[in-house]
Design a protein with these regions (language model features):
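Membrane-proximal helical "anchor" segments flanking the first transmembrane region
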Residues: 1-77, 84-85
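Soluble catalytic domains of membrane acyltransferases
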Residues: 47-164
Length: 164
């Protein structure tokens, strides 16, 4: 895992921080890989983590906001940054989220790894939806008046989209 997509990571950091020196970029890159390894280990931990332990690690500072959202009797979309163990958003169920939860994910080409990721991310009351299936599911739930919560990563770029 060390050195994963090294050129892409370096290129993205140079685009994001044009004012930084090569040394500073290298330091940020090292911190990225440390964080990336932490995320991988936390994803593995998610396979066996209990709801109680998950709630200790994923703290909602304003659970009353979940109640307010649900009181509107509308489905909602929760946008997440592609940061830390965003899979742990499943803990919202333990904070009183009663809507059926859907996690949107990009299907992985390796069938075994795709099944593993789906199993990990759907452990705590979440149904995983491949990106291409989201519009159909939203329309079906709306037609059936089925209130739902959709979790999506907000900061991923479509293939081929690069800042210039």
């Amino acid at each position: 895992m060390v050195g994963y997509r090294k050129n892409v990571v370096k290129s993205n950091l140079e685009l994001a921080f044009p004012e930084k020196s090569k040394k500073e970029i290298h330091q940020i890159q090292k911190k990225f890989y440390h964080h990336f390894c932490d995320m991988f280990l936390e994803m593995v931990k998610t396979m066996s983590i209990s709801g109680t332990a998950l709630k200790k690690r994923f703290v909602v500072k304003n659970p009353e906001e979940l109640e307010r959202l649900q009181s509107l009797d509308k489905s909602h979309i929760i946008l997440l940054g592609h940061y830390a163990s965003y899979e742990w958003v499943n803990a919202l169920h333990f904070y009183g989220l009663t809507y059926e939860a859907y996690g949107v994910y990009k299907k992985i080409k390796n069938r075994y790894f795709d099944c593993l990721i789906k199993r990990i991310r759907s452990k705590h009351h979440t149904t995983m939806l491949a990106t291409k299936d989201v519009p159909k599911q939203i329309l079906r739930n709306k037609k059936d008046q089925h209130l739902s919560s959709y979790g999506m990563i907000a900061d991923q770029a479509p293939k081929g989209a690069h800042a210039k």
